[in-house]
From Swiss-Prot:
<keyword id="KW-0812">Transmembrane</keyword>
<feature type="transmembrane region" description="Helical">
    <location>
        <begin position="86"/>
        <end position="106"/>
    </location>
</feature>
<dbReference type="Pfam" id="PF04284">
    <property type="entry name" value="DUF441"/>
</dbReference>
<feature type="transmembrane region" description="Helical">
    <location>
        <begin position="14"/>
        <end position="34"/>
    </location>
</feature>
<keyword id="KW-1003">Cell membrane</keyword>
<feature type="transmembrane region" description="Helical">
    <location>
        <begin position="121"/>
        <end position="141"/>
    </location>
</feature>
<feature type="transmembrane region" description="Helical">
    <location>
        <begin position="51"/>
        <end position="71"/>
    </location>
</feature>
<dbReference type="GO" id="GO:0005886">
    <property type="term" value="C:plasma membrane"/>
</dbReference>
<dbReference type="InterPro" id="IPR007382">
    <property type="entry name" value="UPF0756_TM"/>
</dbReference>
<protein>
    <recommendedName>
        <fullName>UPF0756 membrane protein KPN78578_11500</fullName>
    </recommendedName>
</protein>
<keyword id="KW-0472">Membrane</keyword>
<comment type="similarity">
    <text>Belongs to the UPF0756 family.</text>
</comment>
<keyword id="KW-1133">Transmembrane helix</keyword>
Length: 148
């Protein structure tokens, strides 16, 4: 029996390797291993909770310099006195808002998810992006199509 999904995953993993993007390659290889082993029973949990777990891990990585003391409190306080830092704060708020709209849109219009996923994988593999794209992309789409 021919497994088209496995072939697509292998192609995307190859794209990750060709573009020297180990994040994509490793992620897809892990999914392939899960798919072809008894671990595939965990897919419903991964589909439901994977995004939340990923955001938690990403947030830990972003907050680690504050927690470790590498980013001292004085630097954090000074960020409110520099126009570039204030702009960064504003952009962070905007992008978080877009991500929230994106989560809502992905839940209400799941047919858009496939396009968002393909676009994100291509962006990560070909342009060295990071896979936070689907949420923000869905948020941007929500602005175009008027859904919140």
């Amino acid at each position: 029996m021919f497994d088209t999904t496995l072939l697509i995953l292998l192609g995307l993993a190859a794209l990750g390797f060709i573009s020297h993007n180990t994040t994509v390659a490793i992620s897809i290889l892990v999914l392939i291993i899960v798919r072809v082993t008894p671990l595939n029973a965990f897919f419903p949990w991964v589909e439901k909770q994977g995004l939340t777990v990923g955001i938690i891990i990403l947030t830990i990585g972003v907050m680690a310099p504050i927690a470790s003391g590498t980013l001292p409190p004085s630097t954090l306080i000074h960020s409110f006195m520099n126009w570039k830092s204030l702009l960064a704060i504003a952009v962070g708020v905007f992008v978080s808002w877009l991500g929230g709209r994106g989560v809502s849109l992905m839940g209400s219009q799941p047919h858009l998810v496939a396009g968002l996923l393909v676009g994100t994988v291509l962006g990560v593999a070909l342009f060295r992006g990071v896979p936070v794209g689907p949420l923000i992309a869905a948020g941007i789409i929500s602005l175009f199509i008027g859904k919140s």
